[in-house]
Amino acid sequence: PLKEQRDTVRDLRQIGLGVMGIADMLIKLGLKYGSQESIDFCDKIGFMMADASIMQSALLAKEYGVFPNYKKECVLKSPYFIKNTTVQTKRLVEEYGLRNSQLLTIAPTGSISTMLGVSGGIEPIFMISYTRKTETLHDGDTYYKVYTPIAKTYMEINNIDKEEDLPDIFVTAMSLDYKDRIKMQSVWQKHIDASISSTVNVPNNFTIEQVEDLYKFAWENNLKGITIYRDGCERTGILTANKPSNKKKTVEELQEELNEAVLEALKNNPNECPMCGGEMFHSGGCSECHDCGYSPCSI
């Protein structure tokens, strides 16, 4: 790391404790994500997390000292500190200070939550189910439905065959009212001293006026920031020279373009496989790559 980075880490000692699986937890408790009961419950969890982490940071400061940039008066007068600590924690901080300038953050936890089979961060579950395709070397790929782990477990325990029969506690990112989503983020923000990673998903027919109302509602609920994603939107570069064409190419047209590009690559370098870069072996008027099995004779 650069000297400036080392100095910043040493002077501030920032860490980012967080949460994962909130939506799964609410389902197991029988609470609908975004309901007032769920928001009140998360409010209590957030306070407990903040108070406990501040207390532990004070105890670490007792043993190892405060972070170099610690300013006692600023911390003790901070509205965040006052609202998120018990009397006992306030006394510990007043006596020993804090080891860390930053303690809590809500990371997206996208990869690890998928790996562990739980919902990410403070997000609602994304989908009840999705379709997975398994490709084979023979004709006919296999398509099958895969359920989100929490939904699959619930359906097995309660002998439910169709996801339509699940109770209304199984709200998803697309079925959840954006106001309930914003209220949930707002209550967590009260207890997080850093940042929150989250996305509000809205349907493709969401209008410009509705987007304006969404941002206004987020502002009214004191959110520091909000990210939305409208279903079906395509990403493009920030700068474009020409207006993109709405015409989509057929599979046959794309395959023809690919074949032409492959043959052109072989023409320029007949000894290198255009697919994997391996060596092409020539025999019987044709050639084949022994690494990936590609042969131009099969085009």
Placement of each model-derived feature along the sequence:
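Internal maturation/activation junctions in enzymes
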Residues: P1-R6, R10, Q14, K32-T109, ...
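Core structural elements
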Residues: T8-G30, R181
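Catalytic phosphate/nucleotide-handling subdomain of diverse soluble enzymes
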Residues: L29, F41, I45-S53, G117-L137, ...
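Catalytic alpha/beta core of large soluble enzyme barrels
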Residues: P79-I82, L92-R99, L104-K248
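Short, flexible, mixed-charge glycine/proline-rich loop motifs
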Residues: E260-N268, E279-S283
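Short cysteine-rich clusters marking metal-coordination/redox-active sites
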Residues: C273-C276, C289-C292
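Short Cys/His-rich "knuckle" micro-motifs
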Residues: H282-C286, I299
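Short Cys/His-rich micro-motifs in 6-15 aa windows
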Residues: C292-I299
